[in-house]
Regions:
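Class I Rossmann-like S-adenosyl-L-methionine
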Residues: 1-93
Length: 93
């Protein structure tokens, strides 16, 4: 089954969280919807501290890394991407 763009971005972010290696190599392998995935990944990298600040207001302790990656994808879309509808950010992530 084909992964959606948000799932691909979450996997790349998960790898970045786990390995601390910059995600450019994984982004180079993305074929479908590359611009959207790139915006998500680089935006999350750029706004990591802001995302963590927002998330810690609602989550008392740090979730597991794969959940944190998905959370970053959803929160980034809701807070920093004007061209993404809220229902899409929540439902698809």
């Amino acid at each position: 089954m084909k992964k959606n763009s948000r799932e691909v971005a979450a996997e790349i972010i998960y790898h970045w969280i786990e390995s601390e290696s910059f995600p450019d190599r994984q982004l180079a392998e993305v074929k479908d919807d590359r611009a959207f995935v790139t915006e998500l990944v680089y935006g999350i990298v750029r706004r990591k501290l802001a995302l963590e600040y927002i998330e810690q207001k609602f989550i008392p302790r740090r979730p597991e890394d794969f959940i944190l990656a998905a959370l970053h994808v959803g929160v980034y879309q809701l807070c920093f991407m004007d061209n993404v509808e809220e229902f899409a950010a929540v439902h698809e992530t």
